[in-house]
């Protein structure tokens, strides 16, 4: 398959630059992966589509304020975007400046903090914080929310809350698992009251999620790697759910990738998993764990639209996107959602 097979023209006004006033006020497009049937709904209608005994799996990563501003010793301005925290003093990061910082040079951050450039790893820089504080403390003090490049505005105070799920737990993501942004506490409680089981995995979404696919042939794409954790209690819950004939519903592509990574690591048997994953899901992939998913509308030619196409069928997904554009759904991180059921192979 060609990367251009996943292209579509999106009018600029359909890119959501701000979230809805209420988390669950978005629209929801449902797609039946077997028939291709589309239905326009509201996000709150999701409650009626998840059955008692179904298991919903959420990604509880917490977005860190991963964008830092500062200057080199020479005075040149630079911008740092954390890709991942290596430990409590060191990060791997993208650095934007007129000239790349040299090894052993000092970077002066806003707020008076300093970092030392330790090494370069391809496009990423290894930086060490020179402070008694931890990286996380410095990010919380002077970091900015790393809004995606297509939200072309400076971050605002409101983004600290809204570019974050209500159930976030483990700091480390530099992009939000956006399908989860639609859920508020009341909706989670309503799902539980209905007899829906809820479980959490962690995948620290990296900045690589916004990197364009730079090859023509899908098979040649080298996927970035991210850290994921699928605990044993979630594995046990999935086994019980499947044994009872109920569905596993993943909230977001990151939850899908976490669960499928765990299955891949143990040759189709689902075992607990903790470590880096570079799983790349595109049409032809056989899903081992997930039966249905909640997901936002993704960028053209992205690995995420490829994943959804693998799940519900390429023609069905591309037709759904054309429908969404026609019906003026809001796209990307702060946009509307889809509820998609898996196409039988």
UniProtKB/Swiss-Prot annotation:
Question: What gene is this protein translated from?
Answer: queA
Keyword flag Lipid metabolism = no
Q: Quote any Pfam family the record assigns.
A: Queuosine_synth
Task: Give the GO cellular component terms, alphabetically.
Answer: cytoplasm
| Family as reported in the entry's similarity comment | Belongs to the QueA family.
Spans traversing the lipid bilayer: none
Q: Reaction catalysed?
A: 7-aminomethyl-7-carbaguanosine(34) in tRNA + S-adenosyl-L-methionine = epoxyqueuosine(34) in tRNA + adenine + L-methionine + 2 H(+)
| Any one GO BP annotation for this protein | queuosine biosynthetic process
Q: Which organism is it from?
A: Shewanella oneidensis (strain ATCC 700550 / JCM 31522 / CIP 106686 / LMG 19005 / NCIMB 14063 / MR-1)
Q: What class of enzyme is it?
A: transferase
In which domain of life is the source organism classified? Answer: Bacteria
Transport listed as a keyword = no
Q: Pathway membership of this protein?
A: tRNA modification; tRNA-queuosine biosynthesis
Record's protein name: S-adenosylmethionine:tRNA ribosyltransferase-isomerase
The alphabetical list of record keywords is: Cytoplasm, Queuosine biosynthesis, S-adenosyl-L-methionine, Transferase
Enzyme Commission number(s) of this protein: 2.4.99.17
According to its UniProt entry, the function of this protein is described as: Transfers and isomerizes the ribose moiety from AdoMet to the 7-aminomethyl group of 7-deazaguanine (preQ1-tRNA) to give epoxyqueuosine (oQ-tRNA).
Fill in the subunit field for this protein. Monomer.
The signal peptide here is none
Compartment(s) of residence? Cytoplasm
What Gene Ontology molecular-function terms does this entry list? S-adenosylmethionine:tRNA ribosyltransferase-isomerase activity
């Amino acid at each position: 398959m060609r990367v251009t097979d996943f292209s579509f023209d999106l009018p600029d006004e359909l890119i959501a630059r701000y979230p809805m006033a209420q988390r669950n006020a978005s629209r929801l497009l449902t797609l039946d992966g077997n028939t291709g049937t589309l239905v326009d709904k509201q996000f709150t209608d999701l409650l009626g589509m998840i059955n008692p005994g179904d298991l919903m799996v959420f990604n509880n990563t917490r977005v860190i304020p991963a964008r830092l501003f500062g200057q080199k010793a020479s005075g040149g301005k630079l911008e740092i975007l954390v890709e991942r925290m290596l430990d409590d003093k060191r990060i791997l990061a993208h650095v934007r400046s007129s000239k790349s910082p040299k090894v052993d040079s000092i970077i002066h951050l806003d707020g008076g903090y300093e970092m030392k450039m330790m090494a370069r790893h391809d496009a990423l820089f290894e930086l060490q914080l020179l402070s008694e504080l931890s990286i996380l403390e410095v990010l919380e003090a002077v970091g900015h929310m790393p809004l995606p490049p297509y939200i072309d505005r400076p971050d605002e105070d409101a983004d600290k809350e809204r570019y974050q799920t209500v159930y976030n737990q483990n700091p480390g993501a530099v992009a939000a698992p956006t399908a989860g942004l639609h859920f508020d506490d009341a909706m989670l409680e309503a799902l539980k009251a209905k007899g829906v089981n809820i479980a959490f995995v962690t995948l620290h979404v990296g900045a690589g999620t916004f990197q364009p696919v730079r090859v023509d042939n899908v098979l040649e794409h080298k996927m970035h790697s991210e850290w994921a954790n699928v605990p044993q209690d979630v594995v046990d819950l999935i086994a019980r759910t499947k044994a009872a004939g109920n569905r596993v519903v993943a909230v977001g592509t990151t939850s899908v990738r976490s669960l499928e990574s765990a299955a891949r690591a143990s040759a189709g048997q689902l075992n607990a998993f903790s470590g880096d994953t570079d799983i790349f899901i595109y049409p032809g992939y056989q899903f081992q764990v997930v039966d249905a998913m909640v997901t936002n509308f993704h960028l053209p030619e992205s690995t995420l639209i490829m994943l959804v196409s693998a799940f519900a069928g390429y023609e069905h997904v591309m037709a759904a996107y054309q429908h969404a554009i026609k019906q003026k759904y809001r796209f990307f991180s702060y946009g509307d959602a889809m509820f998609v059921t898996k196409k039988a192979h």
